[in-house]
């Protein structure tokens, strides 16, 4: 991932004001669906790739995981994780996903939330996860939806009055680097098609269990201004897969 944008103090301060930073998993619009894709975590060894504040790590412990390892390349993220989501069963490691070494056939469950669109080589990640999982181990992750990442800027098209017209989808089949604006900063992401996400998992030996394009929960649609616009295009893609014996 290179230099981590989240270690920029100004950017990190803005991120810390987001709902999912303040309220944790309950502040994430996809959580009500994402959590249902997790297997039973009791007694399991769990790895969280790109753990951020450690919300998913703490959730795993609260659901009786045996041990949890959280990986993140941002020192500031891990500092916050150790502050608000620390536990004797959780080990936080400062490393990029590309460089971290995962012990072979060790973990029962690998999870990742909204990270892989920052990584260029999804194939290498899948191979690493597959090797690190035990037989019948589960890989559950979320990414920004390819429709959301395709054009790059990640902004609605609006008319002269400022009213939203549509979401632009362009260069969908041209995968690779995109420059978007997130929290007022230029952020580099890597667009991949839906086919790439699915077929890469299959090629690496995974069995696809479930693919979901989540909608915000009813209460968010009713209570948060502008949230109903999220029904006009998918923002996220959730996938669960299993390592076949």
Where are these regions (language model features)?
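C-terminal lobe and adjacent flexible extensions of AdoMet/dcAdoMet transferase-like proteins
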Residues: 200-245
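A short glycine-rich, Lys/Arg-flanked "PGG" loop and its adjoining helix->strand segment in the class I
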Residues: 123-138
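Short alpha-helix
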Residues: 176-177, 188-211
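A short acidic, Gly/Pro-enriched loop at the edge of an enzyme's catalytic core
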Residues: 98-110
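A short SAM/SAH-binding and catalytic strip from SAM-dependent methyltransferases
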Residues: 108-122
